[in-house]
């Protein structure tokens, strides 16, 4: 499994929390156990390979991190989504941007450009090309606002 696939799994889990309210540790343990994961593999190719130990650590880190910093991440999205109320942005698109901003700020081994590119890719895949452009604009503005060392 690639980091891109692990990122996509993380988006699924973070998005799922929007509806279940499960704690991050609970949703990761439940959705990534062998039995449940096997059922998902029949429906979605991204579940065809199991995450490695390093990928599981990444998934745990970002799912918990986004859950614990949702308000902060949404404030950043709101700040750079000129003319849009963050509540009007689809939950999935918001989830993708939350993950990207979390990665940029808190995951040292993910370069800013990669976080943005992957967010745009996921937004296009799940919400269409226009959404990819929207996400790129918000995340690009966010990235330009950061000090050079971030």
Question: For each predicted feature, which ranges?
Answer:
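N-terminal interaction/assembly modules
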Residues: 1-132, 136-150
């Amino acid at each position: 499994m690639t980091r891109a696939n692990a990122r996509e799994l993380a988006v699924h889990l973070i998005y799922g929390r929007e509806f279940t309210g499960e704690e991050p540790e609970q949703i990761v343990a439940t959705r990534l156990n062998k039995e449940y994961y096997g059922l998902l593999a029949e429906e979605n190719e991204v579940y065809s390979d199991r995450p490695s130990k390093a990928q599981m650590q990444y998934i745990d880190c970002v799912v918990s991190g986004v859950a614990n910093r949702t308000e902060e991440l949404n404030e950043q999205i709101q700040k750079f989504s000129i003319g849009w109320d963050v509540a009007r942005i689809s939950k999935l698109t918001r989830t993708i941007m939350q993950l990207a901003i979390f990665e940029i700020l808190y995951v040292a081994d993910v370069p800013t450009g990669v976080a943005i590119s992957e967010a745009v890719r996921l937004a296009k895949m799940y919400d269409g090309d226009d959404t990819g452009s929207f996400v790129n604009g918000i995340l690009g503005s966010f990235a330009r606002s950061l000090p050079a060392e971030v």
